[in-house]
Every structure is written in C-alpha cells, then in structure tokens.
Amino acid sequence: MAERLTTEARKQALGGIPDWTEVSGRDAIGKTFVFKDFNEAFGFMTRAALVAEKMDHHPEWRNVYKTVEVVLSTHDAGGVTALDIELARAMNAIAKLTPG
C-alpha cells in the first residue's frame, strides 16, 4: 500500500504541479480543467482513464460540458500519496496534449 505523504511533502510536491491545490476539508488534491468544448473534455477523460487504469489508481471526477473537476486521494492510505502526485502530473501532461 502507498504511504500517505506528510503535509510538508505534499506541499513540496504540489509546488511542482501547476494549478493543483489542496482540497478544503479533505486530505486530497484537486484541479479544474477547462477545455474548448465537451468533445475535448471527454477526450481528456478517456485518455486519463487509460492511464489511471494502468496505475490501478482512479480519480474522483465530474464533467459538465467543457469542464472536468478532479479530486485525487488514496482511500486505502487515508490521504494523498505519491500515486496521486504521479496521476496529477500525468493528467497535466494529457491536458497539454489535448487540442484547443
């Protein structure tokens, strides 16, 4: 099982992942992605889902039209772990490759 990051380690990791922030009231990180339209948003989710499945680490997320809200936390560890940081970085990379 992945180990929960300390507060300091989480803050340091977040410093290297643009636009990800701590989720208020939870030991979790989150980001809202905004795309050109629904097709791009859903395409992002599809590509991110493939990565998440390979990692066996799945996000909490919500899609409304061109917006995708993501929350990451490792439930087994009770908070943010290196897996969440890795998936956040991957999602940022996928978003950069998404046209628009």
Swiss-Prot record:
SUPFAM superfamilies attached to this UniProt entry: PCD-like (SSF55248)
The EC number(s) this enzyme carries: 4.2.1.96
A GO molecular-function descriptor: 4-alpha-hydroxytetrahydrobiopterin dehydratase activity
Protein's recorded name: Putative pterin-4-alpha-carbinolamine dehydratase
Cysteine pairs bridged by disulfides in the record: none
Organism encoding this protein: Bradyrhizobium diazoefficiens (strain JCM 10833 / BCRC 13528 / IAM 13628 / NBRC 14792 / USDA 110)
Cited Pfam families: Pterin_4a
Reactions this protein catalyses: (4aS,6R)-4a-hydroxy-L-erythro-5,6,7,8-tetrahydrobiopterin = (6R)-L-erythro-6,7-dihydrobiopterin + H2O
